[in-house]
Amino acid sequence: MSQSPPERFILLDGIRGVAALFIVHRHAEQFFGRDPASSYLAVDLFFALSGFVLAHAYGKKLYEGTITPGFFLKARFARLYPLYVLALALMAAYFICLYVLGLPTPIDDLHRLIDPGELAFALVTGLLFLPAPFTLTLNGALFLVSPAWSLFNELVVNAVYARWGARATMKQTVLVLAVSAVVLMVAAAEF
């Protein structure tokens, strides 16, 4: 008996693709020009749709114990880490070139010279997928690859989902959604 292929959500894949393009544009506006207003919401849309797809693909397996939270996290890490390491290597090479040439970083608000100790520390924390206690890049993202803040948070949320979310009751889910809605409204009013 053959297994049927996993269900694909073609429309959702398309919407996620468009959201990903907005995200790339937002992170590379020096190449593409000013980002469209409210394009930051594409990150939220992308994560919401990705959460749906992940819950569909892994939720039942996690709930039934067919796969462990550890297996799920290894699969997520294996999916995210290779491309992230490539981006990390490119950014490290970029900063090393700036250091060798004695040029300040153009993507730091302070336009300061590169400190090799900070660069090495940021590279080590980056390889561990952890934020550094300082930033070499724009807007205090605390990662050598500044968009990596979102990947770090995605892995944290994936860990929470794998451990508790897939087995949450309706009452627990409603409570988490209510608290999240309040936090989101406070953040929206603040920022």
From Swiss-Prot:
Inducers of expression: By certain acidic polysaccharides found in carrot root extract. This induction may be regulated by the polygalacturonase.
InterPro entries with a match to the protein in the record: Acyl_transf_3_dom, Acyltransferase_3
Subcellular location: Cell membrane
GO function terms (MF aspect): acyltransferase activity, transferring groups other than amino-acyl groups
Main location as per UniProt: membrane
Pfam families to which the protein is assigned, alphabetical: Acyl_transf_3
Cellular component per GO, a single term: plasma membrane
Protein keywords: Cell membrane, Membrane, Transmembrane
Function noted in UniProt: Seems to regulate the surface properties of the bacterium in the presence of plant cells or plant cell extracts.
Family: Belongs to the acyltransferase 3 family.
Protein name per its UniProtKB record: Protein 2 in picA locus
